[in-house]
A protein has these predicted regions:
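Nucleotide-activated chemistry modules centered on ATP-dependent adenylation/adenylyltransferase
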Residues: 1-216
């Protein structure tokens, strides 16, 4: 089960953090809609991991003392590119690393294999540390640059899932996470046309990945 909680307020189902904040998984569940939340139960949501282990041990579960996984549990070897190729049946061709001016500075193993903010595993000797600053999936290019190039003051997106209300109609102060392990950051979310909304951060945020799901506390 997942560490999260669902509560009903009026006619709306709301997604709440788990009692065990260290194990909370609401970041990964933030795209669940009202129909899905109405049919979901999270029996672990009100328990801590220690309490779950104690219950498992009392009932003779052999994995009661199993160490917690520290990464994606279904990719035990940590080779995500190889997993993607096995899972999708696709081959991801090599492409170019570019600097901020668009100059080719090296070759990569496929843009899908990299994440914004990544430093390790690039295989580049640039004279100074560089990080993944952007990706063009159509052109299969990965742009690298200094750490300061990773900061954003806002993000804009569509296909939002609203829990307290059907639609966002006015600006709302929120706290936002753009990564699972991140501490919530203050900001304001503004409605825009055609289902889009824009979040402006009080403080610029590092490595706001375009493809990430973002969760906010309303």
């Amino acid at each position: 089960g997942h560490y999260a909680q669902v509560r009903k307020s009026g006619d709306r189902y709301l997604l709440y953090k788990a009692a065990d904040k260290a194990k909370d998984q609401t970041y990964f569940l933030a795209c669940l809609n009202q129909e899905q939340l109405a049919r979901i139960q999270f029996p672990l949501g009100g328990l801590t991991k220690q309490e779950v282990r104690a219950i498992a041990e009392e009932n003779g579960f052999i994995n009661a003392r199993k160490h917690d996984s520290q990464d994606i549990c279904f990719v035990p070897d940590g080779d995500y590119p190889a997993f993607l190729e096995r899972y999708t049946g696709k081959h991801y061709p090599a492409g170019d690393f570019l600097d901020e001016s668009g100059r080719v500075v090296g070759k990569h193993r496929g843009a899908v294999c990299y994440t914004l903010g990544q430093r390790k595993g690039l295989g580049l000797a640039m004279g100074a540390p560089v990080y993944v600053c952007g990706k063009d999936m159509e052109k299969n290019t990965v742009t690298v640059g200094p750490n300061e190039a990773l900061f954003s003051s806002a993000l804009r997106g569509n296909n939002w899932v609203w829990y307290p209300f059907p639609e966002l109609t006015e600006p709302v102060k929120v706290t936002v996470k753009t990564r699972h392990s991140q501490t919530e950051q203050p900001g304001t979310i503004y409605p825009e046309a055609d289902g889009f909304a824009r979040v402006e951060f009080d403080i610029p945020q590092r490595a706001v990945t375009r493809s990430e799901e973002h969760t906010s506390e309303l």
